[in-house]
Amino acid sequence: MKSVYFFDTYEFTRWFDDRLLWDYVPGDNTTVPDRPCIGKSRPIAGDNANLVLLNLDKVRHFVFLKDDIPFRAKRDKAIFQLDINYKPHRRRFMERYFGSPICDAGIIAPRPEYPSEWTKPRIGLYDHLSYKFILAIEGNDVATNLKWIMSSNSVAVMPRPTYETWFMEGRLIPDYHYIEIKADYSDLEERLHYYIAHPERAETIIANAHRYVCLLYTSPSPRD
C-alpha cells in the first residue's frame, strides 16, 4: 500500500482492533468487486454497493484553492492542460480542439506519437484561474482537477462523469454544479459561447459548486 493510502486509512483503522483485517482494492477502480471492499473510486452506473468509498490519496485528489479573481474578470476562454498518455478520450479532445480560439489546449507529457506542438509548459494550478472555464476530463477514473475547479471562481466543463470518489461525482447535477458537454465534446464551443454571453448563469453554477464543496468539511465519514 502506498504511504499516502496508509495514512489516509489509518485515520479510521486506528479505532479498530489491530488483529482485524479489511478488504481493500488499491488504485483506480473501474470495476466493482464481487465482495464488499474499501476503495478510492468506483463506477457510477449499476450496482456499485460492494465498493465503499473512503477519502484516499487526498493529498492529490482533494486540493482546494482560494480564488480572488471574479468570474467576469477572467479570460473568455477554456483551458485544457492534462496528461493524455494511455487516455484515448483525452487524445480525441486534443485532436478536436488544439488551436481553437476559445480553448487553450495543450498536453504536459510529450510522447513521440503526439504532434510536438501539442506540448506546452506546465503551469501551476493558480495560473489556470485566469480562465473562465476549465476542462475536467476523466483520466483512468475520475478527473482529479474537478475538486479544485469547483472551489474556484472558474467553471468546470466536462461530459457527465462515469466514475466517482468520496467526492461523490455521481451526485453532481449537470448545468447546476458544472457545465455539461457531450461525450464527444462536439458542443464545447457552443456551450462556452452561451455562458460567456450569460455570465450570471455561470456565476450561479459557481455558487452551487462552492456549496457542494463545503459539504466535504462536514462529512468525514465513508461513503456507501
Regions found by a protein language model. Give the residues of each.
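Nucleotide-sugar donor-binding catalytic core of glycosyltransferases
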Residues: M1-I181, R191-H193
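Secondary-structure boundary motif
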Residues: F98-G99, A197, L215
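C-terminal "capping" alpha-helix adjacent to the active site of nucleotide-linked donor transferases
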Residues: K182-E200
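A short, well-ordered alpha-helix in the C-terminal region of glycosyltransferases
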Residues: R201-L215
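Conserved small/polar residues in nucleotide/adenosyl-binding loops
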Residues: Y217-D224
